[in-house]
Amino acid sequence: MVSACLAGLHCRYDGRTNHKPEVAELVASGLAVPVCPEELGGLPTPRDPSERRGDSVVSNAGRDVTAEFAAGAEAALYIAEEYGCSAAILKARSPSCGCGRIYDGTFSRTLIEGNGLFADLLLKKGFEVFTEETWPGLSPEERASAPYPGGLSASSSSSDISPHTEPTCGR
């Protein structure tokens, strides 16, 4: 499973994308499914930026959007389980997908230790969670056997996404 914005979908809060070609290739090859928990929770794109404040998620306009974020996390978890996913590559620092470090809820770009709601849920369910900054990527051997530069070969499997077994934020 991957954050849809990393796969090139325009679902970021500002309607843009956080496209990472290597993540998009996982989706294109059928090795990962893209999700945007915030859209799945009913939030529009574009939308106000939001940050976690303790157990809540609030927009920069002061609106409590915790219910939408929680509903989206549950919907994305359902998709992950239906597809048999065991690992995820999620958007760093996001109030949904951040893993290990997120913004502190003051909209000052200050980072604190913590996870987004969706990342938290995946970790509690035993998934391994990476961000685009911590995912180790494909090995040189996998790259060499790929049918196109930087791509995946037909012999690749979903286990290529997760080289570890314990549920942690990849570092």
Positions of predicted regions on the chain:
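Short, hydrophobic/glycine-enriched beta-strand segments
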Residues: M1-A4
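Short, active-site-adjacent cap segments at secondary-structure transitions
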Residues: G8, G42-L43, P95-G98, G137
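Short N-terminal binding/cap micro-motifs at the start of the first secondary-structure element
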Residues: G8-G15
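Short, surface-exposed acidic-centric catalytic microdomains
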Residues: N18-S59
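Divalent-metal-activated hydrolytic enzyme cores
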Residues: L40, S50-I79, T110-R171
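Active-site charged/polar residues at nucleotide-handling catalytic sites that mediate phosphoryl
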Residues: Y83
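Short acidic/polar active-site loop segments enriched in Thr and Asp
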Residues: S86
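Internal, conserved structured core segments that host functional sites
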Residues: K91-F107
